[in-house]
Amino acid sequence: MALKKSSAQMVADARARIEEIETADLIAMVDDPSVQIVDLRDPRERERTGFIPGSFHCPRGMLEFWVDPDSPYFKDIFAEDRKFVFHCASGWRSAISVDTLNDMGFKAAHLKNGFSEWVKLGGPVETKG
């Protein structure tokens, strides 16, 4: 079965439309109270590799429901007046997610190259336990 559009093309299209934050810039903002970093990765990814201190975990499958004030799953954190920066491991899931959120009317940005580059560039990482 041939697809109309590949996942790589979806990511490229999304990245052309959204705000992308470079890793070094987000590392500099990690303690800024006006910025909320949101981790879209699976819980197992967070357990295995750690997470950005102060980040809020929102599993990708719940994102649209958690940001929608009319949804029974709405999370109050998304009503706060902050800059929301979403990330995943490589930037693919977060690019598509932020494109979807912007389409919904929720202003957001994403970490361009994801958590893997965050770790590579020495960004702070927290682990449980």
Functional labels for PLM-detected ranges:
Residues 87:
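Short, surface-exposed ligand- or partner-binding patches at beta-edge/loop junctions that are enriched
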Residues 38:
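Active-site flanking residues adjacent to catalytic metal/cofactor-binding acidic residues
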